[in-house]
Amino acid sequence: MELQYISYFQPTSSVVALLLALVSILSSVVVLRKTFLNNYSSSPASSTKTAVLSHQRQQSCALPISGLLHIFMNKNGLIHVTLGNMADKYGPIFSFPTGSHRTLVVSSWEMVKECFTGNNDTAFSNRPIPLAFKTIFYACGGIDSYGLSSVPYGKYWRELRKVCVHNLLSNQQLLKFRHLIISQVDTSFNKLYELCKNSEDNHGNYTTTTTTAAGMVRIDDWLAELSFNVIGRIVCGFQSGPKTGAPSRVEQFKEAINEASYFMSTSPVSDNVPMLGWIDQLTGLTRNMKHCGKKLDLVVESIINDHRQKRRFSRTKGGDEKDDEQDDFIDICLSIMEQPQLPGNNNPSQIPIKSIVLDMIGGGTDTTKLTTIWTLSLLLNNPHVLDKAKQEVDAHFRTKRRSTNDAAAAVVDFDDIRNLVYIQAIIKESMRLYPASPVVERLSGEDCVVGGFHVPAGTRLWANVWKMQRDPKVWDDPLVFRPDRFLSDEQKMVDVRGQNYELLPFGAGRRVCPGVSFSLDLMQLVLTRLILEFEMKSPSGKVDMTATPGLMSYKVIPLDILLTHRRIKPCVQSAASERDMESSGVPVITLGSGKVMPVLGMGTFEKVGKGSERERLAILKAIEVGYRYFDTAAAYETEEVLGEAIAEALQLGLVKSRDELFISSMLWCTDAHADRVLLALQNSLRNLKLEYVDLYMLPFPASLKPGKITMDIPEEDICRMDYRSVWAAMEECQNLGFTKSIGVSNFSCKKLQELMATANIPPAVNQVEMSPAFQQKKLREYCNANNILVSAISVLGSNGTPWGSNAVLGSEVLKKIAMAKGKSVAQVSMRWVYEQGASLVVKSFSEERLRENLNIFDWELTKEDHEKIGEIPQCRILSAYFLVSPNGPFKSQEELWDDEA
């Protein structure tokens, strides 16, 4: 995905065109016509021919200085179409002068293969470097300042490519980055959900920067943002989050890179006629490019410095360098730069990192965006193909839903796209008809021979991929969009990775796009999700397929799509499943949402953090002995191990179906923002390998700035939660069927009242600390009056944790009651909670304790027992001290808990 550069002549203004014409006319007076006509064929004596456009053609069309550049001056003309028409007349290989350069054009797969194999591949392993790149992207500061896309072929290029491919674009590294890629894709799809939702809510009056009318999405803008967010996250560590007043680093970078992209689309005179570089100076183009380069340099430098400061801070705190410093590609580069053998190690401005970053960002966005746009356009114009794609996608996810090993039927992952062969065929066919780069450009670094013709060093090569991929000698019905061709025995093995020369959308040879795997995976993931989750229609009927001139193929008319969400129907629990849940021996209660919930659940929080093998075995044993309710959370880091245990329990037949289980999870405060709630739930579902959860909760009545989950929270990260928007996002999760019920945790009466003032769906559950040592009488009364179930945690006082207390298990009152009834103190505490009408979540890992916990339902506490328990001193254990700050929304425990502490 290296940057492609537009280097044919396209006047930047009428002044430039006039100046060039005047220079050409004056030059024709002093330059002998014969000299010009023989200019290209003045090669060393050789037995080979020289590939020259016919003398008659040159005589009638060529101009001094500019050569045949004027043929490509037409703003409405497409260079690949013009070259294709010339190939029809002059054959699959011909050449002509463009300014002061020689240009060789090849248009058949045989000629292209000859260019990109053997010794010729080495000869054509360089690229022309236009003025914009040299001026803006640091390519004018010597070889140690070149980026991967522009550095001449040689040892330094191999070193840089190794760094980029091994640390960012290899299949092994992409596996490590998968969760980051999916997270950013989820964020972008959440915005599509919001567009559909708001369009419905406002009866067609919803308009944002990415919409042009009711329900109509400007897909070009959305895909551009998605591509930038994905590559920006894995390269620079950019985080998506709510916008603040001042422009963020991400916004500054976007502005600078967009300005640079504009200059990259221009064609300075000096790119084709270096001796006329003064024209670019005269028009101010060079000056403006330099100004843009300085701006971009400052932004990228600040981003790299941010990473350096983070690394120093992490080392000062004694953090794990592998975890903290290898979060993105810049971190990896900085680690490598500390090694003495990396080129440019002594360069204080670290220009190689800047160049690589810009290469990755620039090259990683356009190909994905353009190919997806053309693919969607073709699908909208060929509804029968779209219908067949829907059938494949729907069938795959129906099968996945029924699978006992993986019930994540509503969540698309990279493993899914491997099985969707028709989706893969659609993308191949789209790239065949509309390659993002219709002409692949190279520069010969040495003399070579192609097709029997002598090609001097310094010749520009234009490989007309567009023409080659529409060759009727190779493709049946080459102008027809027919993905099924890639399902046939003859062509199903044809690949786009540069080995099949009849299909080269990513180029070939040594300079083939290094990010093929990344681009294909991302395109297939996005296309699959669009087809699975949305109905798509063109608001104007037939989509216009006109492309812009240039070496990158953009649509002239942006693509607008009318999107309607294909709502996932909430999974309705069957009466049989409810009976199975109750027959386990644990009573059930009906929530305000109408869903049935066991009153006793197993907690999965472990103080060691991530879920362990011990925990997986404990969950399996819990299911075996009768537990049907399991509580987890993103912050517990136990979702994955719970998902593994559920899948294994289904395999072993411990439960008949997933519907027999009640699974609750909870986001963390860093995701308590309107645009991150659905993303967080989807990530939890992916970890759990489930289609839905039964209960999804907010953890506290506060938000934190988006970032990693940690208890070491800087005071400046604590912010007030916007109850209205965050709860609306929770409601949308329930409406979409990703959760059956929604609830909160650690909310006081006052904060519940504030939340419900704007809620359409009231919280079904409030999960809070509750035990005989902290009885929550006021909160219980309020929740009962509002049909909110209190779900108790820390029922045993969190004994054994750093914040825990022996107030429950060490209580003399409870010990006496337990002794009198022949029960344990834990059983007495749990029975008391149950008799208050609350559900409870208790963590136990041994089989003995698991069975003991279940034996609380066939006996009762007396009135006298309740009176004695009511006299136990009260004290809160879970204080949430990390949310209290002099400058935050809660300046004291009293403000956080509203005097309920």
UniProtKB/Swiss-Prot annotation:
Enzyme Commission designation: 1.14.19.54, 1.5.1.27
Short name of any one Pfam family annotated for the protein: Aldo_ket_red
Annotated keywords: Alkaloid metabolism, Heme, Iron, Membrane, Metal-binding, Multifunctional enzyme, NADP, Oxidoreductase, Transmembrane, Transmembrane helix
Cofactor(s) listed: heme
Residue stretches spanning the membrane: 12-32
GO annotations of cellular component type: membrane
One GO MF term: heme binding
Primary location group: membrane
Catalytic class of the enzyme: oxidoreductase
Catalysed reactions, semicolon-separated: (R)-reticuline + NADP(+) = 1,2-dehydroreticuline + NADPH + H(+); (S)-reticuline + reduced [NADPH--hemoprotein reductase] + O2 = 1,2-dehydroreticuline + oxidized [NADPH--hemoprotein reductase] + 2 H2O + H(+)
Pathway annotation: Alkaloid biosynthesis; morphine biosynthesis
Keyword presence, Metal-binding: yes
Example of a GO biological process term: morphine biosynthetic process
Binding site for heme: C513
Cellular localization per UniProt: Membrane
Membrane topology, record value: Single-pass membrane protein
CDD domains per the UniProt record, alphabetical: AKR_AKR4A_4B, CYP82
Family per similarity comment: In the N-terminal section; belongs to the cytochrome P450 family.
Function per UniProt: Bifunctional protein involved in the biosynthesis of morphinan-type benzylisoquinoline alkaloids. Required for the isomerization of (S)- to (R)-reticuline. The cytochrome P450 module is responsible for the conversion of (S)-reticuline to 1,2-dehydroreticuline while the oxidoreductase module converts 1,2-dehydroreticuline to (R)-reticuline.
Protein name, as recorded: Bifunctional protein STORR
Organism name: Papaver somniferum
